[in-house]
Amino acid sequence: MFVGVDHGTVGIRFAALKEEGGRVTVFELSRKKAVEMDGEAIVKVIEKGLEIKREEIGLIALTYSMGDGFFTIKNINNVRNRGVRSEKAGSIVGGGTKVFDALENSGIPTIVIPGIHAGSEKIDRRMKFFSHCASPEKVGVAYFIYKKGFENFIFADISSNTVTMSVVEGIIIGAMDACLGSPGLYQGPIDLQLLRDIEDGRVSANDAFSTAGVLRKKWLPGVDDEDLAMDCLSLFAAMEISAMCVLMKDYGIETSDSKVFLTGSAGEKADIKQRIDRLVGVETETLTKYSAAIGCAEIAKDVFYGAKNILGINVEP
């Protein structure tokens, strides 16, 4: 039995992959609920939610926060500061920290997956211009797609924030994080007015980022117009996907030779898909919101059986 953990912005998603028959069970724990629980209670709710016993687990693959403090897949006992350079960026609730610590103290074999950032070894060196490209659960999404038989692809995870990643010949070559390109529902890039607000002390940089999404930023004329917000989200997500197409073309992969996937709470909506398909000129495929957790479970399984490299990320012995 192998378990994957997706530390999302709103909730923490879990997936268990059984060896016999490949049966998958999934469940989601809200970060706010997790923060109220102790370590043993968290392990028990994982057992109940996934319909497993801890003794059955061969390996867990865990993601946490930005994952920018390391660049190889590590045993949880060898990760410093939970694998992050700082806890001050992004949505801070405390539930993910509780889950990390619960698994670290549980005795269950656990590995931690890094994010994609300037320290990543195999990404395009030009992408290292940005300190951070994608958080660790996006590696899980990419592996979920890879295990379906795709080696050249792009995916956009459109939810609280938007992150788009490209993979060429089974190697992650680049990604664009929420603070760089397309906004999400709640989080987004910091523009000129937000820079002024930060400089004037009206808002912190983290709060500015956390309220720069299409549903939180004060940009809609008059009353809230959700259709305009979704149209805006689709446009910028399509532009970000197109940017990844340019990167892949530089590797000799035309858009017609690759596949584009959508996931996330907004990405899985039919109207968002239709808009993006029209704008990019491709037929995208929608993934389950549990794709990151399932992909992480697949990583756990393959590492357990000796995999030394996952999508260009080395596995520490």
Question: Language-model segments: which ranges?
Answer:
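Glycine-rich phosphate-binding loops at beta-strand->alpha-helix junctions
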Residues: I253-I276
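Active-site nucleophile and cofactor-binding loops and adjacent substrate-binding regions
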Residues: F130-V139, A156-S160, T284-A292
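Gly/Thr-rich phosphate-binding beta-strand-loop-beta motif of the actin/hexokinase/Hsp70
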Residues: M1-F27, F150-A175
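Adenine-nucleotide phosphate-binding core of ATP-dependent small-molecule kinases
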Residues: V203-T255
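Glycine-rich phosphate-binding/hydrolytic loop that grips phosphoryl groups
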Residues: G267, Q274-R275, V282-P317
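Short beta-strand-loop/turn "lid" adjacent to the catalytic site in phosphate-handling enzymes
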Residues: K53-F130
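Glycine-rich phosphate-binding loop plus the immediately following alpha-helix
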Residues: K122, R126-N152, E169-D225
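General beta-strand structural signal in soluble alpha/beta enzymes
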Residues: V5, I60-L62, P109-G115, A134-P136, ...
